[in-house]
C-alpha cells in the first residue's frame, strides 16, 4: 500500500507541474467545458435547469468557472491536486476479498471520508419518471471496468430503462481528417456497447437487459457527437 501512496504523490507532483507550465490549459478547459455544457441545453424563462459534474480528472480548473445553478454540484470523485488523490480498482467484485478491498476505489473513498454526490443526478421516482435527470453527458472517459460501479449507480438512479434520460457521448472531432473521426466513433461505440451490455446484465428483467441499447437508440436516448477541441 505504501508503494501506491508514493505513486499517487509522484503523479500529483507531475500533474501539478504540467498544469502550471501549460499557459493555455485553463482557457482551453473553460472553452471546452462550456461547449459541452451548453450543447443541446434547453433555455427560457419557463424552463429551469441545473448542471452537475462528476469529474474523474484530478485538476479543478473547471470548478473555478462552474455555475451549475442552485441544485448543481461539482465533484472530483477521486480527489484533486493540492489534496489527496486516489488510484484504485473497481470494487464491484472485490469488496469481500480482504487482500484486495483496501485497493478498491470504493474502500479508499470511504476511508477518505467520502464525497457529497447527492446532487449529481436527480433520481427517478416510481410515480413520475420525468423527475429523473434529463441528460447525462460523457467525455474523455474510457468507460472501462475500473469505474463501472459509478456508472451502474448513476444508471440505476435515473432508472435508465424506463425513464427518458438521454445519454450523450462526445469524442474529439477533426474537421480535416474524417478517418480520425471514424476511428474515434468506432472505439467509442465498442466501449459504449461493453458498458451497456454489462449494465444490462444487472437488470432484474433479463429481456430488458438484452435490448437496452436497442431501446435507447429507438427512443433517441443514445447519441454520439463530435466536439472540436481546438
PLM-predicted stretches and their roles:
Residues 1-117:
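Extended, H/D-rich, highly charged conserved domains that either
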Residues 1, 38, 108-112, 116, ...:
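Arginine residue identity/basic-tract feature
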Residues 85-131, 178-198:
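Acidic, metal/cofactor-coordinating or nucleic-acid-engaging core segments within structured domains
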Residues 124-230:
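SIR2/sirtuin-family catalytic core signature
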Residues 40-43, 65, 120-128, 155-157:
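Generic recognition of flexible, low-complexity loop/linker segments
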Amino acid at each position: 500500500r505504501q508503494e501506491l501512496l508514493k505513486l499517487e504523490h509522484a503523479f500529483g507532483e507531475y500533474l501539478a507541474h504540467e498544469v502550471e507550465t501549460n499557459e493555455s490549459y485553463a482557457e482551453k478547459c473553460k472553452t471546452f467545458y462550456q461547449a459541452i455544457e451548453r450543447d443541446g441545453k434547453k433555455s427560457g424563462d419557463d424552463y429551469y435547469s441545473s448542471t452537475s459534474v462528476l469529474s474523474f480528472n484530478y485538476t479543478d480548473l473547471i470548478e473555478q468557472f462552474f455555475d451549475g445553478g442552485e441544485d448543481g454540484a461539482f465533484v472530483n470523485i477521486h480527489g484533486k491536486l493540492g489534496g489527496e488523490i486516489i488510484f484504485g480498482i473497481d470494487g464491484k467484485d472485490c469488496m469481500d476479498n480482504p487482500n484486495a478491498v483496501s485497493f478498491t476505489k470504493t474502500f479508499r473513498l470511504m476511508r477518505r471520508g467520502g464525497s457529497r454526490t447527492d446532487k449529481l443526478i436527480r433520481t427517478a421516482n416510481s410515480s413520475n419518471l420525468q423527475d429523473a435527470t434529463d441528460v447525462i453527458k460523457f467525455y474523455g472517459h474510457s468507460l472501462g471496468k475500473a469505474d463501472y460501479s459509478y456508472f451502474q449507480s448513476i444508471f440505476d438512479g435515473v432508472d435508465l430503462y424506463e425513464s427518458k434520460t438521454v445519454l450523450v457521448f462526445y469524442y474529439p472531432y477533426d474537421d480535416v481528417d474524417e478517418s480520425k473521426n471514424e476511428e474515434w466513433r468506432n472505439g467509442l461505440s465498442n466501449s459504449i456497447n461493453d458498458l451497456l451490455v454489462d449494465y444490462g446484465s444487472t437488470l432484474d428483467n433479463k429481456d430488458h437487459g438484452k435490448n437496452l441499447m436497442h431501446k435507447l437508440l429507438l427512443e433517441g436516448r443514445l447519441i454520439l457527437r463530435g466536439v472540436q477541441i481546438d
